[in-house]
Every structure is written in C-alpha cells, then in structure tokens.
Regions:
Chain A
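Catalytic cores of nucleotide-enabled group-transfer and carboxylate-activating enzymes in metabolic
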Residues: 27, 50-52, 248, 260-264
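Short acidic-glycine loop/turn motifs at beta-strand connectors
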Residues: 34-35, 76-78, 107-109, 241-244, ...
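Short, contiguous acidic and Ser/Thr-rich linear segments
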Residues: 35-45
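Gly/Thr-rich phosphate-binding beta-strand-loop-beta motif of the actin/hexokinase/Hsp70
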Residues: 214-257, 390-406, 570
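Helical "lid/coupling" subdomains associated with nucleotide-phosphate turnover
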Residues: 262-302, 306-309, 318-395, 401-657
C-alpha cells in the first residue's frame, strides 16, 4: 500500500506540468464486422441499440421487439445460451453457429459480432489493432484550445445597412481581434446565401483568423475533429469532440497499401518501379481514410460537412505518400525526404472527403526515419515538458523506435527489431486482431490466455508472445539461452504435456485443435523464441547505447512509456523478464496506447502543441546505431534472457499489478 | 517657355515622392486582326518580321524573300503604293482591297492589318481600347520589388549528405532569412525530380517566403508577370518584365460577358434570373483572360509555366464574378458585396491557365460601387503619397467615378454619367476601336480627325465627341445652351455645308459617305449633344459637390488625372471647354492611360503597393450624391456649356499643348 501511495505522489509530481492522465473507464467495446466498427457502448446495451446510430443496417419488421426474427447477427465471441425468443425464431444450426438476434443480445463484455452470415477471412483482416485498449492522454476541459473554434453570432441589422461586405459584417460581429479575418474562396462562394438563410444569426467556424464556414446557430455546439494514425499495416481514425476532448468513435482498417508490399521498403520499391506507383498508393490510403471517416461520422450521427479539421501522423514515408510527395529519396543516399516541416493543406486537395474548407495538418518529421508517429509519441509522453526527469520511450512495431532524455536533451535511435514483435515471422504469429492471444498468465498450474474479441485463439500476436515467453522463462521451460527444454521433474508439471518434441527440437503447444478457433493447433516453436531473442536483443542494445551516450544508469530512468502495436498491450513485467527493458521498477512502466493518434489528438485539441511538435523535430538528436561498435557488442550480449529466480506463481500477481 | 519650365519644376516637386512618370516613346503600334494583337515594333520594321515572335502564322514558301507571294495580309490603315514585287505577285483586285505581302510591308505609322482575307465585323469587335496610347507610370529599376522574385542557387553538396529534406536544402541555400520557407503541395510534388534534374544548381521562384518552383538556372532572368484590367466591356491584359518594369506586350478583347448584358446592371439581372448564371459569366471571363494570356505569352516567346503571378483589377462586380462570388448583393439593399478585402488565391483555383503554383492577386475594393479599378486609378495618381496637394481624378467610363483630395483626406463619388462618354446612345457613337474618331481639331478653317488605326472613320467615340463639341462651341456652331445653330455669317464658314437641317433640327455632318469607311455618313445630332450635356453636367456637379465638401475652390486643385475609356484620349482643353472639368490651368491635366491596369502593375512591380491599396480602401470616404440637394442644383446649373470667347484658331494649339 505504501508503495502505491508513493507511486501516486510521484506520478502526480511528474504530471504536474502536464495535462493529467486519465484512462477512460466504463462501458465495453463492440466490434462490428465486416465494417470493423468499434463502438464504445454501455454495459448491458443491446447490439440493436448500439447499431441504431451507425450506418450498419439490420433487417427488421418488428422494430426491435424480438418478434420478427430478422435482425440476425453472428456473435464471434463467447456467448451465453439463447433467449426464449431466439429459440423460437432461430433454428438449431443457426444457434450453434452463434447466430443471434441483435435486439435480444445484450453486451456485458467486449464482443465481436458479424452482420454478414458468410464470414470471409478477408473481412477479418479489417481488424482494429489498437483501440480495444484505450488509454489516451486526457486534457482537462479548461485547457482545451482546439484547432477549430466556433462562435455563435447575431450580426446586428444596423451593421448591414451601409453596404458592408458579408465578410466585414462577420468581422464586426467577432470583434476587433478579428480585423484581419480571411476566408478561403469556397467559403466566400456560399457565404451570401448562408447569411441570407440564417438571417444573419449563425455560427462562425474559425481556424485561427480564417473563416471556414457560416452555419446555423444550432451547429455551434457540434464541434468535432479527426485524427488519423497512418500505420504501415493499419490505419486508425478517431473522432474527437471539442466540447470535452473526449474520443467519440474509433475505426481502423488494414492499410490497403499492404497489397503493394507489407512494409515501407517494399512500398518504396513499388513506387520506384512503377511510374504511377506513388499515385496508386496515395489513392489507396486516401480511400481507406475516407472509409474510416465515413464509419466514424455515421457512428456519431455526423456528416462530412461537419468536419473542418483532421490531423494525420505516420512515419515519414506514409506521410509523404498521403501528400503525394515522392518518398523515394528517403531510401537512397543522400536519404532526403522532400519535406520535414509540418504541413497544413486543404483536406480536399489531398482527396479527403470532409467539409470543402476543411484543413489537414500533417505532422512534422525529423528525417526520413524519424517520422510524425515518433514525434507524436514524444508529445504524448510529455517528455518535452520535463526538465528534470529522464524518460524512456519505446515504439515497438516492425522497427523499434527508441527515445531517451528530457526537455534538456533528447536522443533517439532506430533498431531493426524485426517483425517478430508484430507477430510476423512467428509460426502462428498474427497481428493483434480478433482471435489473437494478446496476453498470457500462469495461475494455479494452468496457462490462461486473453484473446482479442473473447473468441477462441487463432494465433498469437506480439504482446502474447512476449508474455508467453516470460511465463515459460519463469516456469523454467525456456532457459536463459532461449532453449525450450524437455519436461523436467518438479518444473511446471501441469504444462509437460504441452512440450512437444518435433525432430529433436522442442516446441510448446499453446492451443490444441480442440482449444483453437479453427481446430488447428497453435504452437510456439524454438525458432519463434530465436526470432524474439533477436528482436529484444536489438532493442535492449539500443536502449543501453542511448543510456551510455546520455551518461545514465537504469536507476536514473524516471518513466518508461510503451507504444506501438506491441507496446500497447504487453505486460510491463514480461518486457522486463525477457530483458527487452532494463530492470526498472515495474511501476514506472506505462503503455500510452496508440501514441501516434494520441499525439495527433493533442495537437487537435490544444493547438500550441503544433508548435511544440515543430520545435521537437529540431530539438531531438538522432543516434545512428548501424555503424557503432558498442551497439553491436550490446546486441550480442542482450540476446540471452536475463537471470531471474522469480517463482511462477508470482507472475500472475505481477502481471495484474 | 518660362511657363513650361515652371511646370516641369512643379511636376518634379509633385513626383518627388513618387516613382517618376515616363511616357514610352519610340516605335509604332501594329494591330493584328482578327487576333487583336497589339505589337509595339520599331519604326520601319516589316509586318513579316513583327509577326515572327508571335503565334500568328503566315503562309510562306520563300521565307520572307518576297518571291512566293503567299504571305498575304490585308492592310486596313492608309497605305502607300505597292512594291514592284507586290505588283507582280498580287492581282489588281487584291491591291485595291489593300492586300499586301507581309514581308514587303514596312510599318512607319500605327497600322491595323488583318491576317484573314474575310474581314468579319465580329472580329472587329475584338479591338484594343486602350493601348494604342500608352502612358504608364514608370518605375525606376532600383525601386522594383516585384511580387515574385527569383534566386539562382547552387546547393552545396555537403548540405545534401545528411538526410536533409529537399525543402530544407533550399532554405539553407537561400540563407537564414528564409528559415520559415514554405511551399505549396504542387511545388513539393515535383521538387525531388527537379532537384535531381538540375543537379541542385537551379533557380528558386519565390513569393514572399513561399517557394513556388525550382527551375533550371537559365530561367533565373526570365521574370514576368501579368496584369488584367477587368473592364465591363473590354478586357485588357498586359505582360510586364520584372527586369526593368517594362510593358512587354498588351492584348485586349471584348468582354464575352457582353453577350449576357452590356452593362453591370443587366449582368446582375442575368445572374439573379439564371441558376447557373454566375458560373456561366465566370467561365466567359476566365476563357477571355486565358486567351489574352496565350496571346501575350506567345508574342513574347513565353509559356504558361513561365508566369507565376497575375494582378487583376476591375469594378466590384467584375472582380466578384471572376472569383465566382455572387455579386447580387451589390444590387439590392443592403448593397453588400461578399468581400471588400483584396484576395490572393491560387490562379488555377480560379481557372486561369498559368504555372500550377501561380498566384492571382485581386484588388481590394471600397464597396459595391467603388471597385478595384478606381483604387488602381488612385494608386496610379499617387494621391496617397501626397500630403499637401489636392488631386482630382476622373474615371470617365459608363459611370463617372470621381475622387478629390490628398493623403490627408480623400473623397469619392460616383455619377451616373450615362453611356454617352463611351460612345453609346450617340447616333454614330462607338467604343474606342479601329475606325473611331478619337480626336478632332480645327485648323485653317478645316476639321481634322484622328481615327484609331489610321483608317477612314466609321463613327465617333467618347473622346472624339468631347473634342468635336468643344470645337463646335469654339466655332460658334453650338451655342451655350447646346443648340446646333443654323449657319451664321462670319462663323466658321468652311463648315456651313456640314450643318444639315433635318425636320427642323440641325445635325452636324462629321463625315460624308465619301469620307467614311463604309460609305455611310457620320453625323453628330442635336440629340447627341443633349446626351453629352447630361453626362458632363453630372460629372461637373459631382466635382463641385466634392470641392464644397472638402472646402476648396478650383484654384486649389493641384493636379487633374483622367482615366477610363474616355479619359485616356480626350484632349484636356476640350474637357474644360465643354465644362466637364472646372476651369483649371490646362497644364495640370494629364491622362493616366489605362489606370486600372497601371495601378495593378504598380502592385505587381512594387509589392508594398498591395498594402497601400488595402489602406486606401479603408481611408477613402464615399459621398453618396443621389440624395443631395446641392448635387441636384449643380447638375441643373452645369448642363449648359460655359461661356468662353476663345477663337477657333487657337484650339489646335491648345490641343497639342
Ligand atoms: S428486430 Fe425483429 S427480432 Fe430483432
Ligand atoms: S513570304 Fe514569300 S512573299 Fe512574303
């Protein structure tokens, strides 16, 4: 207890200069396939009610009374017995398939449903990797200063008597601060009719000293903005309300560019080799973003015309492609991006379907390899606002991006951690989507898995992998050098049957055919452990190199923040147990959720962060690891797992701490 | 002589704070129909040579040697006898028609030619009203500060080693002053290829702190810009060189919107009554401007991509239409334009075909009735830079726009002068185009006409009308009340045969069928004189009202500047003689040419004038005449012509003074 208290005080101190952190609580997530809509709904709400405000349409003759039997959905998560009405209206086969009536299905835990009967694998790919676990940096309402503001105005009729221009009438209404008010052409095009229609009682939509639109007065409180996380594999869109800074809706989809290459390197190759390559990739991502937008807006009952602002963050290549800028310079000497500055453009110019005057902010970057996503992460961590405390940040995706430092000095490096941490190159690895084991614990002699969407497991994602290896290390099934050992007496005997010797090498059976989603066994192979060792070794070596360069030891690290596909869900203890993180106090490790979108949302909600991001890009120092002898030595040294003599039983406690 | 000297000193004093005035001398104008190209060429140059740099193509097999007989043109101006080669290669009928060989025709006086044999009336409409008389405000080279600048740069290869972005490399090349350099998306799109192609030795095209393009180094000296005068009836485009501020080419055409109404009022009506009316008028003017641009550029051997800037000035309605902004508010209470501020937009956004990054500056206006054309005129007059001297400006077109004052206080008013001054509502009136009598003098008992294009007269334009009435007043043929009197003994007896009594009213025969272009007589009717009296009475009353309001007399006026269709060409003496101007000293009256385009060119060439124009719009005070008793009384009083006892013989001298 005492320790907890200390921690809290410490945290409060740390955050004193930052907006307070707050984890959104209450409610459960409903993931609606194939649209991959993620809805935050009240516990116990029916699926029918939850879908009322979305553009997902269910058939119905009875209007949700449970009598027509038409509002069929397929529940993919574990589900209790059917209701009497469902037994009457659905046949046996349907009930066994998980078919239920939306109006009779109440949601008490996170749930995945499909609104189409045919469950196509392709549709399953469109899965949210991030928002089933939502922790974003909370901004107290008084600190909100969104990029877009609205002012309800009644233009005095006197003002209009003497041939005053429409724009000048609005300037007068806004007061002398807006003497230099400007307006883009498309706002001016519709201004006279709109003023007439509203009889000069309306709402001015403002971006700095620029009028974007004139709306009816009832629109004054409809203030929303979007952020986009331009991930290489997954795109995430979030809708924020400016009234209280809350996240209203989240949607994500697989980045359609994946068809042209799974990673940045293969997409750069595609662009170099195809004359229209850049334009085709640009169109793919723009289409994806437009679809996300349409999901987000319909789930909140909004229209395209209601959105005047979006902020996008991604790696340098993704941001370049979105803007139609050639990223090929990033891949070749002298490794020049076209642009590192942040850019504010008309959203329509880029192809985004929002209000015609809407603006798109695209994050600044440091270089071709330090993108807007990493800067967003730094913003989210509050490191720029810390003078005295050293913060370590890890963005654990395909690359491991690391930063270490404070507002005084901030270093970054990039390690080619390899795709293992995203579940790739792992026998039964998968990205963090419904069906992926995302967490593992060992309690009372048995393994327990947390599976995304509460369905039976299909495979394992990065966070599950790290957890599992940590558990097996604790159980003594994996040794310090990474070997999966044959069953040993006295060591986790309940798991002995899961150690399978195949051609002289031991693999670990995570789920038997009976336990798995598609009746195929799920293994952790010896090779998988080796992949993980490579990945975690590179990251640990990167951290150590930065620590040396800044001249600190493990004890000097004040906070550790995790982000990225893995970083969001991994148990802090596991990262320390496998030696990915140095042996810091567990309590200083925190996941920042989807840090790219959170950083972008900070800018959306508090405009001064745009300037902070630009300064940050100038401020940070990049450390190139590839040619450093110290890094290579640390890398070899950190391939092994650290010694630790924790008893398996204590792991569960640690992991829920 | 002494007087001249005084005048010069006085002028220099007046201009001490202004760029010096300079009238372009040397060379002659060649007007090429049906393209209506106006070329300023060296005296004695052949038509063939003159057309080499244009996009007008002549047939030829001999390459201008005078042997193939294919380069036929029709000379509309007076022309001397054909050359021997022409006699051999052309037949009698052709020679009589004015057909000549371009390569054998040398131009010694302003000349109008047609490159098509069929002379269609429609093509004749495309006539320049302004530039056959070119007096623009000259800006000394050291004072040039054009809206667009270019800098030849060699980006150091060192700079490129460390992953610097393309834009940052250019920032470094430009020096610390350009730390905040921005670039529009379409510039960034092509930047990497262009940097590669030029091997980082190139030319930065800059608009303030914005990079518009990266060109090859040889483009560094190709610096040009356009101005557009958006006249209700005529559009004028001018191409300026930023190297020395000189006017490189001029083109004009009838405003195609005239098909939808001759004046502003009828176009506003068209827009109100047709849902697509605004868009169709906008397209018409944009097409016209694109055609003018293409003429201007081809005559200077330039391409669309060479032009990064255009400045447009017109009345408020014309500017609104060009921008696609509804002007209907201007016509109805509360007489609100959409916008009075000056606007800088991407030229392509408006539909102008220039470089994709090119900008269009559209002049600020004061109100629906005081447009960018009048502000341009004020800028041109230098009134804003005058603290002590009162300047009177008259823009004499369909409306008479008047300003009076100095940099301390500046009043304007608008008089519905009526269309007489533009040659409309006059029996044989026409706008100032080839065939219009634009000047009249009386020497040695005979009338002499100056006809635009040096052809036989077809009619009379505003300046000719004012001149003619002034002459007839001096001759005693028109009396103080405006009556054309029957022949009187001892009064201009050489003209007696021209006074024709028709149904009890006297008309004046300006040109007999033999003297006229199309064998039809050209008259000045009694009714025409009445129209002129109405127009000049309104203007004179407007001037007097402003003088009263500012509290000055005629002797306090330091300079009088004339602009507009009429103001450009009218003889100052005539304006005083008919009482349009108060009886100021003749030497202080000066025509400022096409003041709308000159004001726009000041902004193009010296960017601080953009700010000046904005301040001017705020500064000027408008005096509404329609409800003022004093104006109405002055109007009635000034319908008559002033008494004066000048002898006819002295008129010629006065007019050439
Ligand atoms: S809507 Fe009719 S049963 Fe659900
Ligand atoms: S070009 Fe052959 S005669 Fe003129």
């Amino acid at each position: 207890m005492k320790k907890e208290k200390n921690l809290k005080r410490q945290n409060r101190g740390h955050l004193s200069e930052l907006p307070a952190q707050k984890y959104r609580l209450g409610g459960v997530w409903l993931n609606v396939l194939p649209d991959d809509l993620w809805l935050r709904i009240s516990t116990g709400e029916s699926v029918w009610e939850a879908l009322q405000n979305t553009d997902v349409e269910l058939e119905s003759d009875c209007g949700g009374m449970g009598t027509c039997g038409k509002c069929k959905i397929k529940v993919l998560s574990e589900i209790g017995p059917p209701s009497t009405q469902e037994r009457e209206l659905l046949n046996e086969w349907e009930l066994n398939q998980g078919i239920r009536l939306a109006c009779r299905t109440r949601v008490f835990r996170d749930m995945v449903i499909s609104t189409t009967e045919a469950e196509r694998e392709e549709e399953y790919l469109k899965i949210l990797t991030t928002s089933h676990h939502l922790t974003h940096r909370y901004i107290p309402t008084p600190e909100l200063a969104p990029l877009i503001s609205k002012q309800r105005l009644t233009l005095s009729p006197d003002i209009q008597q003497d041939g005053l221009s429409d724009l000048d009438a609005i300037k007068l209404g806004l007061g002398s601060e807006y003497n230099d008010l400007k307006a883009p052409l498309n706002c001016l095009h519709s201004l006279p009719q709109k003023l007439k229609k509203t009889q000069s009682r309306g709402t001015a939509v403002l971006h700095e000293h620029c009028l974007l639109d004139w709306q009816t007065q009832d629109k004054a409180d409809s203030r929303y903005g979007l952020v986009f996380d331009l991930g290489t594999s997954t795109l995430v869109g979030k809708l924020f309300s400016f009234a209280d800074g809350s996240e209203v809706a989240v949607a994500s989809c697989l980045n359609s560019q994946s068809r042209r290459g799974a990673d940045v390197i293969s997409r750069l190759k595609f662009i170099r080799e195809h004359p229209e390559g850049l334009e085709s990739l640009r169109r793919l991502v723009v289409n994806d973003l437009n679809q996300l937008t349409s999901h987000l807006l319909s789930s909140a009952g909004l229209h395209l015309e209601d959105i005047f602002i979006a902020v996008a963050a991604g790696n340098t290549t993704m941001q370049h492609i979105l803007l139609g800028l050639s990223p090929v310079g990033i891949a070749e000497a002298p490794f020049s991006p076209v642009l590192t500055d942040g850019l504010v453009v008309n959203a329509r110019e880029v192809g985004l379907r929002l209000h015609p005057s809407a603006l798109l902010y695209v994050m600044p970057v440091k270089s071709g390899y330090i993108g807007g996503d990493l800067l967003s992460f730094m913003l989210t961590s509050g490191v720029t606002e810390q003078e005295d405390e050293i913060i370590l940040g890890l963005d654990l995706g395909t690359n491991g991006e690391i930063f270490l430092g404070s507002g005084k000095r901030l270093l970054t490096c990039s390690t080619a951690a390899g795709p293992a941490l995203e579940g790739a190159r792992i026998s039964h690895g998968m990205i963090a989507k419904a069906g992926a084991i995302e967490g593992v614990s060992f309690e009372e002699g048995e393994l327990h898995y947390r599976v995304i969407g509460n369905i039976k497991p299909k495979g394992i994602c990065g966070s599950g992998l790290v957890d599992l290896v940590a558990v097996l290390l604790c159980c003594g099934i994996i040794d310090q050098e990474g070997l999966i050992r044959p069953p040993q007496q006295g060591v986790a005997e309940g798991l002995h049957s899961r150690i399978i010797n195949q051609a002289g090498v031991n693999d670990f059976l995570i789920a038997s055919p009976e336990e798995s989603y598609d009746s195929r066994p799920v293994y952790l192979t010896q090779k998988d452990v080796r992949e993980l060792q490579l990945a975690k070794g590179a990251i640990a070596a990167g951290i150590k190199t930065l620590m040396d360069k800044i001249g600190i030891g493990t004890q000097d690290i004040g906070h550790v923040y995790l982000a990225g596909a893995l970083g969001n869900y991994v148990a802090p203890y596991s990262t320390i147990r496998i030696g990915l993180l140095p042996a810091v106090n567990l309590e200083i490790v925190r996941s920042l959720g989807n840090a790219a979108s959170t950083g972008a949302s900070l800018i959306l909600l508090v405009k001064r962060y745009w300037q902070t991001a630009a300064e940050l890009a100038q401020f940070i120092e990049h450390v190139e690891l590839s040619n450093r002898a110290d890094f290579n030595q640390y890398f070899i040294k950190h391939m092994d797992f650290p010694e630790e003599s924790l008893q398996p039983d204590s792991i569960a406690t640690k992991q829920t701490a």
